[in-house]
Amino acid sequence: MFEFEIKSNCSNTEARTGIFHTPNGQVNTPRFMPVGTLATVKGISSEQLISTGSEMILSNTFHLHLQPGEKLVKESGGIHKFMNWDKPILTDSGGYQVFSLAKLNNISDKGVEFRNPRDGSHVFLSPEKVMQIQMDLGSDVAMAFDHCPPHTANENDIEDSLERTHSWLQKCVETHQKSNQALFGIVQGGKYPRLREHSAKFTSSFDLPGIAVGGVSVGEAVEEIHSVINNVPKFLPINKPRYLMGIGSLREISLAVAKGFDIFDCVLPTRLGRHGTAFFNDERWNIRNARFKNDFSPIDKTCKCETCKSYSRAYLHHLVRNDEILGLTLISLHNISHLIRFTNAISAAIKDNCFTIDFAPWKRSSIAHHTW
């Protein structure tokens, strides 16, 4: 039911194209996943999302458990029916949110007790509970519950959290019983290569349908992000999809693909879109700026998204300067389309054997310009 089929390999790098087969359709890789935390990509309908070329989205177990609750989603027919999205869905376990958003009361090998950030009530999440929530939600891919410490933690604290993550993974594997849902483990270990290697080998030993690398891009220096991207893949199985969590910049996606990663997610395209910032090649444009007031060209004349086909920079400038919701939706649509287009161009370049680690297909001098 879940299979990762490698279709082509790059001769210059570790990049590959593939197809991840799921019960709700296939995901062509490399692939960017938009983030729909509460079963919605903010400000965008499922129909609009399809127009961007999105093939898989991410929702969050932590937030959906708090509101509206997994039982209601299950009663509706599952998360796909609940949000009217018939393509694959991955649910993050909520580990990162528990440790970054909630006021912790107690943490043990059994789980985490914390205060609900919505109403202050006490909530307890264990690996077993997180698995049950995700099984009730009915996503295609469930993520194991992990302990994601702050990037400022020292090596001893990160090692302690890593052992907890590994213990929880064992419990997740024992609890997860849904044949039409894949379970992915998560590699942790912070900025320490020894711990990352240990975690990658331990997580890989379970032979799960896929494997993720977490605790990346959580405030650490870019050199530390690149160290993880460069070093962890060598300890991961080749025949499984590799998911690098929380990465959405073109530079990091290109580097990660070159090192053999396949799937990415990030809130960046919609978060920036809601603030009036649009992607153009490898730049970010603040559409509120006065220079766009009389500019009647699209954001990007080479882009085929619904926004660029129908609306000018001047119109978008007018919308965002007047805080019209439509403007934020249209820019978010373009930003998501831009990242999907980028990963599509990477795929084409890998197949044509012209992908490079500094992939920039918008440059006319690039040998991969034809993919853009």
Curated annotation (Swiss-Prot):
One Gene Ontology cellular component: cytosol
Domain of life, per lineage: Bacteria
EC numbers for this chain: 2.4.2.29
RNA binding: region residues: 246-252, 270-274
Record pathway: tRNA modification; tRNA-queuosine biosynthesis
InterPro entries assigned to the protein according to its UniProt record, in alphabetical order: ArchSynthase1/Queuine_TRR, TGT, TGT-like_sf, tRNA_ribo_trans-like
Alphabetical GO biological process terms: queuosine biosynthetic process; tRNA wobble guanine modification; tRNA-guanine transglycosylation
Reaction(s) catalysed by this chain's protein: 7-aminomethyl-7-carbaguanine + guanosine(34) in tRNA = 7-aminomethyl-7-carbaguanosine(34) in tRNA + guanine
Gene Ontology molecular function: metal ion binding; tRNA-guanosine(34) queuine transglycosylase activity
Alphabetically ordered keywords of this record: Glycosyltransferase, Metal-binding, Queuosine biosynthesis, Transferase, tRNA processing, Zinc
Active-site feature positions: 92 (proton acceptor), 265 (nucleophile)
Residues that hold Zn(2+) according to the record: 303, 305, 308, 334
Cofactor annotation comment: Binds 1 zinc ion per subunit.
Entry cofactors: Zn(2+)
List of residues binding substrate: 92-96, 146, 188, 215
SUPFAM superfamilies: tRNA-guanine transglycosylase
Functional summary from the UniProt entry: Catalyzes the base-exchange of a guanine (G) residue with the queuine precursor 7-aminomethyl-7-deazaguanine (PreQ1) at position 34 (anticodon wobble position) in tRNAs with GU(N) anticodons (tRNA-Asp, -Asn, -His and -Tyr). Catalysis occurs through a double-displacement mechanism. The nucleophile active site attacks the C1' of nucleotide 34 to detach the guanine base from the RNA, forming a covalent enzyme-RNA intermediate. The proton acceptor active site deprotonates the incoming PreQ1, allowing a nucleophilic attack on the C1' of the ribose to form the product.
PANTHER family: QUEUINE TRNA-RIBOSYLTRANSFERASE
Description of how the protein assembles with itself and partners: Homodimer. Within each dimer, one monomer is responsible for RNA recognition and catalysis, while the other monomer binds to the replacement base PreQ1.
HAMAP family: Q_tRNA_Tgt (MF_00168)
Designated name of the protein: Queuine tRNA-ribosyltransferase
Organism: Prochlorococcus marinus subsp. pastoris (strain CCMP1986 / NIES-2087 / MED4)
